[in-house]
Amino acid sequence: MYLTICLKCIDYKCLDLAIILKIKQEKNHMKVITISRVYGAGGHSIGKKVAEALGIEFYDKDIIKETALAMGIDPELIKAAEEHITKGDTLLRAISPISYDYKNTIFNYERNAIVKIASQGPCVILGRCAGEILQEEGIDCLNVFLFADSIHCGKRVGEILNTTDVNVIAREIKKQNSSRNAYYTRYTGKHLMDSQNWHMTLDTGVLGFDTCAKIICDAVR
């Protein structure tokens, strides 16, 4: 016996609704993805690829905007504070309207912004100790760390800085990685590049950006 399907009899509106509901259900079961990385490993690019593939939001600079809004100050001041948070108190004393424990104040506002964003549904969050923060809050997440060797990182950083000077590139990589690790250690008590802190670590130089993005997507689907 053969089953003949009449295309005219298919209710495409119901079919479309079923597809939409399936997508919504998949999103509801999806974890929040946090991505941390060494400088030059391509975290921003891969994070955006993952978010686009999964149809969810990607957050990086948005956290700065959310924090600045909550604190009532210019987002550029939050950005400057992030960059100098491990380098001393002078800048933060000058820009912060809050007189008590200004370093921790900025971090706590960012923490609140991260929790608020993650509570709204599946998304990709870049950096800022998001994985540790969400785990402490009991929010289900997949914490990913991206790395690459000095050759791959150096090539990418050279493109970012628009330079081929290997000394300039090496200094910038060392500075950024040192700053990121100091920030992470300050607020988590852990080492950024310790693989035990992450659910998944990926070598972006060996695997490539597209493959890394696919692996992350497959892990949360």
Which residues does each PLM region occupy?
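Short beta-strand-centered segment that lines the nucleotide-binding/catalytic pocket of NTP-utilizing
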Residues: 57-68
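Long, contiguous binding/interaction regions
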Residues: 112, 128, 132-133, 137, ...
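Conserved phosphate-donor/acceptor-positioning beta-strand/loop module used by diverse small-molecule
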Residues: 137-160, 167-175
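Glycine-rich phosphate-binding P-loop
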Residues: 35-48
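ATP-dependent small-molecule kinase phosphotransfer cores
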Residues: 68-122
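Small-molecule kinase domains that catalyze NTP-dependent phosphoryl transfer to phosphate-bearing small molecules
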Residues: 85-93, 165-210
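Short, Lys/Arg-enriched N-terminal segments with co-localized hydrophobic residues
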Residues: 4-29
